[in-house]
Amino acid sequence: MSIETSEATVKIAPRLKTRYADEIKKTLQDDFSYVNVNQVPRLVKVVVNMGVGEAARDSKVIDGAVRDLTLITGQKPMVTKARKSIAQFKLREGMPIGAHTTLRGDRMWEFVDRLVTLALPRIRDFRGLSGKQFDGNGNYTFGLTEQVMFHEIDQDAIDKIRGMDITVVTTAKTDDEGRALLKALGFPFKSED
C-alpha cells in the first residue's frame, strides 16, 4: 500500500514562522545569551476578544461580532456568556456578552503576520503600539477601536463598528524579553521618549 502525495497536500509553513526559526531565534539567543535554544521566547497563542455589551439588550448583535471574528481570524469564535446577573446593566446569567477566539500554531503565525504587515499600518493616525501594556511576564495586550483595518472585512457590509482586544501570549519570563521578541516579529512600538 503506497501513499500518494499530490501538490495540494504539501504544507507551506507561514513566512513569519520560518523567519522566526531561521533568523529571530538566533538573534534573541545571542542578545540575551541563553545557554539552551529552548530558553528563547516564542509565541504560544493569540487571543482575540470582542466584547459586545449591547448584546444584553439585543441578542442579534452578537451574530455580527461572531461573523466579523470568523472573517478576521479564520476560525469560529466561542460566544462569551455572562457569569452572573447584574441588575444595573439589565444582564442575566448566561446571556451572550461577547465572543473570543484562541489562535495557535500556523493560524496564529498567519494572523500575526497579517496584523503586523497589513492591518496595523491601515489604522488612521497610527503612531505605534504602546510599550507599557506588557503584563510583567512577557505577554502583551492591546486594543483596536474598529475592525475596518482588516482586509477580510467588507467595508460596505459593516453593520456596526466594533473594537477588539488582542492578547499575544509568549514564553518570555520578563517584559524585556517579550518586547524584544515582538519587536523582532515586526510589532511597531512607539519609541520611548
From Swiss-Prot:
GO terms for biological process: translation. It holds the Pfam family Ribosomal_L5. InterPro entries: Ribosomal_uL5, Ribosomal_uL5_bac-type, Ribosomal_uL5_C, Ribosomal_uL5_CS, Ribosomal_uL5_dom_sf, Ribosomal_uL5_N. Gene3D superfamilies: 3.30.1440.10. The keyword Glycosyltransferase does not apply. One of its GO terms (molecular function) is tRNA binding. Keywords: Ribonucleoprotein, Ribosomal protein, RNA-binding, rRNA-binding, tRNA-binding. GO terms for cellular component: ribonucleoprotein complex; ribosome. Part of the 50S ribosomal subunit; part of the 5S rRNA/L5/L18/L25 subcomplex. Contacts the 5S rRNA and the P site tRNA. Forms a bridge to the 30S subunit in the 70S ribosome. Belongs to the universal ribosomal protein uL5 family. PANTHER family: 60S RIBOSOMAL PROTEIN L11-RELATED (PTHR11994). HAMAP family: Ribosomal_uL5_B. This is Large ribosomal subunit protein uL5. The lineage of its organism: Bacteria, Bacillati, Actinomycetota, Actinomycetes, Micrococcales.
